[in-house]
Amino acid sequence: MLVSIITPFFNEEQTLAILLERVAAAALPAGMTREFVLVDDGSRDGSNAIAAEFVGRHPDAARLLSLPSNQGKGAAMRRGMSAAKGDIILIQDADLEWDPADYARLLAPYVDPAVSVVFGSRLLGHEAKRIYYHYYLGGRMLSAWTNLLFGSHVTDEPTGMKSFRRGVLDGITLGADGFDFDPELVARLLQAGHTIHEIPVRYQPRTFKEGKKVRPRDGLRALWVLLQIRLQGKQRRA
């Protein structure tokens, strides 16, 4: 079973090289192999060169895709997903907040063919680390809002460690360009009837000085996206 690890990045030269080495070294469950799909979202620093050097060392397993300008996480993810060849898609942000050492546990549930979506949760089994308390509260609010709207039981809706079988994309359309990609993905998956399984993962938050990009307004936008999709109802395919 092939796992496509998609890493969108924008100006992450301080963390990208370390992250990619950790992704390459991370253990996977027996019977799983990996491909690296790196998507440069218009970086203006040395990130592209770092990614290109990594691809040069892993030519059979890694690809670098580049957007002509900074278009946002959602645009980068759609580009990466369209190129991915794996049976499972795994989203790995480039900021070192999410530990690839958790891959084995994140992917283990896929031995059950009935499991289609697995997220990593910061709130299961570990004391959630936090630097900005309002982000912690915002995450709890987003999770509660998601559960209210869709009848789900997620504990960490805004988690940056998401995975799903490639086939789930056949029934949904994603159009968000920015960080609203995440709530859009969650809402569409739940709306399509998929159960989101969660496993505990580690989390090392970074500060704005260290390059954190998500802002409080993105949380407010996420609340609206979730509600908007709930009100729209299920997508219909022609």
Question: Predicted regions: what is each one?
Answer:
Residues H153, L174-D177, V186-Q204:
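Catalytic donor-sugar/metal-binding loop of nucleotide-sugar-dependent glycosyltransferases
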Residues L67-A83, I88, P100-F179, P205-V225, ...:
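Acceptor/aglycone-binding surface of glycosyltransferases and processive sugar-polymer synthases
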Residues R34-L38, N48-A83:
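Conserved donor nucleotide-binding strand/loop of the catalytic core
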Residues E12-A27:
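Short, well-formed alpha-helical segments that are part of the catalytic scaffolds
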Residues Q14-I18, D45-F54:
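Acidic helix N-cap motif at the loop->helix transition within catalytic regions
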